[in-house]
Swiss-Prot record:
Keywords: DNA-directed RNA polymerase, Nucleotidyltransferase, Transcription, Transferase. One of its GO terms (biological process) is DNA-templated transcription. Its EC number is 2.7.7.6. It comes from Xylella fastidiosa (strain Temecula1 / ATCC 700964). One of its GO terms (molecular function) is DNA binding. It catalyses: RNA(n) + a ribonucleoside 5'-triphosphate = RNA(n+1) + diphosphate. GO terms for cellular component: cytoplasm; DNA-directed RNA polymerase complex. The N-terminal domain is essential for RNAP assembly and basal transcription, whereas the C-terminal domain is involved in interaction with transcriptional regulators and with upstream promoter elements. It is an enzyme of class 2 (transferase). Homodimer. The RNAP catalytic core consists of 2 alpha, 1 beta, 1 beta' and 1 omega subunit. When a sigma factor is associated with the core the holoenzyme is formed, which can initiate transcription. This is DNA-directed RNA polymerase subunit alpha.
Amino acid sequence: MTVTVSQVLRPRGPQIERLTENRAKVVLEPLGRGYAHTLGNALRRVLLSSIPGFAITEVEIDGVLHEYTTVEGLQEDVLEVLLNLKDVAIRIHSGDTATLSLFKQGAGVVTAADIKTDHNVEIINDGHVICHLTKDTTINMRLKIERGFGYQPAVVRRRPDDENRTIGRLILDASFSPVRRVAYVVEAARVEQRTDLDKLIIDIETNGTIDAEEALRTAADILTDQLSVFGDFTHRDRGTVKPASSGVDPVLLRPIDDLELTVRSANCLKAESIYYIGDLIQKTEVELLKTPNLGKKSLTEIKEVLGQRGLGLGVKLENWPPPGVSQYGMLG
């Protein structure tokens, strides 16, 4: 007997209960036995690792050369100040990076509200304490904010040229994920006479830069996109992408601009005559790292963007470039 997709029990729309401003409980039922654990575990992993967010990644403080410095008039040591900066919840409305400043004079509490922002940057927890000034002194710092995924320790984000970086520029471990906590439980569910069903209850808490419902929806979209590649088994040879009978896969003919890479990464690729996605996926990691000004951070970005589309590096393409595609990045 063959079981079709339509015969698998489909749950009703999720029930969402907002517990606090940044926390919500989502209930999904009824689910077939075992499906609640399958979906709950997958969603939890994606929520904690793959939801994009913003974090302070670099700091410069006047008079501070390294993180183990103590500053006269500052109650905390610099290391504690940096730890407090990591918990500032920031959202950039347009773009991936921003540079902000903080200036405070006189004894008192320094909070996230003292960070100078513009219309494009929003600080959610402006009451968050950064440090305390114990006398009539000043603190002046510059903060770099970047967009990213998950958790990235400072050692991973250091570039080869960082040995020549500005003295006093402190690189922080960055937690980009806006999701602070995810927990799920599975309970029994019943539909009429059926009692062998599951109920999935997910408890999500964010830092306020994104609401829990939107975070869950984004996680579901990511899982859907990743699983969609199993709907097409035409490319069974993992080492070679073969053109369809009608020609080359149209995705490979799209310009690399469609990948929405950072300007730095895109310019580095174009400088090496990499104009199409088909050009890019044929390169290996080693080849890309030899590209001038393209470091490990850019390579990680490229791999993540390709992975979201079911693509990867080091792929061999037959008969590339196809007729009509020039080496100068123009169709014709």
